[in-house]
Amino acid sequence: DVVMTPMTLCYFNFYQTESRKGEGLHIGGHIPFEKVYAWNPYEGMSDEAREHIIGVQCNMWSEYIKDMDTIEVMLLPRLGAMAEVQWAEDRRDESTIRQKMETMRKFYDACGWNYAPYYFEGRQ
């Protein structure tokens, strides 16, 4: 059995934007929210192989990350996209995730958490 965690989709210490908009020093390429949300961990697998996937996982390698505030920004809101990949599987809907993430943004604000604004820009 396996937990799916491919580097090109699940390493959240990678940049969130291609232009690296004030994201500080990190490592690797970029993995935007939309790419995480669109991931189908079962794509191209037989039913038999699917049965061996017990979950998905994102990773945060911290050797280039200076503090917890930066970790929050690197995780949020992509962590919400990863949760949808696991929970909703093939029931995901772009219009639904936008609404859910607006609700989550209010929650992040109420908790005083830091998050990357890139997904939300122009959607208020």
Residues covered by each model-derived region:
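Substrate-binding groove of N-acetylhexosamine-processing glycoside hydrolases
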Residues: 1-124
